[in-house]
Amino acid sequence: KSDYIFLLQGLWVTVQITFCGVLLGVVLGVLLAFLRYLKNPIVDIIIEEYVDILRGIPVTIQLLIFAYFILSGVIQSKFLIAVIGFGINSSAYVSEIIRSGIESLDKGQMEAARALGMPYPMAMGEIIIPQAVRNILPALVNEFIALFKETSVVGLVLVNMFDLTFASKALQSRYYRPEPYILAGIIYYICVKLFSIFAGTLERKLKK
C-alpha cells in the first residue's frame, strides 16, 4: 500500500509541474502573441526564431541547458527549474495556439473596433481575446496533455528530482522488478485518457 502511495505522491508532483508549466507558458504565450500583432518586423523575426528554436530542440536537451547552464547557481529548487524549463518550452506552442485562435476570427471585428477609436490593446483585450478563447481552450488542454507526458523526463534529467518517473525508478531499484515501471505507464495512460475525455467534452460544449 505504501508503494502505491509513493507512486501517487510522484504523480501529484508531476501534475503540479505540468500545471505550473502550462500556466507560465500561457502567460508568456499571450505576451508573445500580443507582441507579434504589433507588426514590428524586428520583433516578428525575434519571436519567430524563439518559437522555432524551442519547437526544434528536444525538451530533454532544453531542460538540461536550463538546469546545468542558464539557471545553474541561480535557482536551487529543481521543481522551479522544471517549471521554468517546461513553461518556456510551452510558451512557444501556446503562442502559436493563440495566434491561430485569433486568426480564425473575422478580421473585420478588429477593423471595426479600431474605427471606433479603441486602442489596439483594448480591442485585443475586450473584443478579440474573449472570442478567441472558444477556439483556444481545447488546444490548451491538449498542450497540457502533451506537457504532462513530456515531464516524464524530469526524474531522469534532474538528479534526485522526485516525480512519478523517479518514484517508479526508486521502487524498481528496491525490488528489481519491472512492475513499478508498468504501474507508472498505466498511471500515465489513465491520466492522459481522462484529460483527453475532458478536452473532447470541452470542445463539444464550446461548439454548441
PLM features: what roles do these ranges have?
Residues 1-208:
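Transmembrane alpha-helices and adjacent helix-loop boundaries
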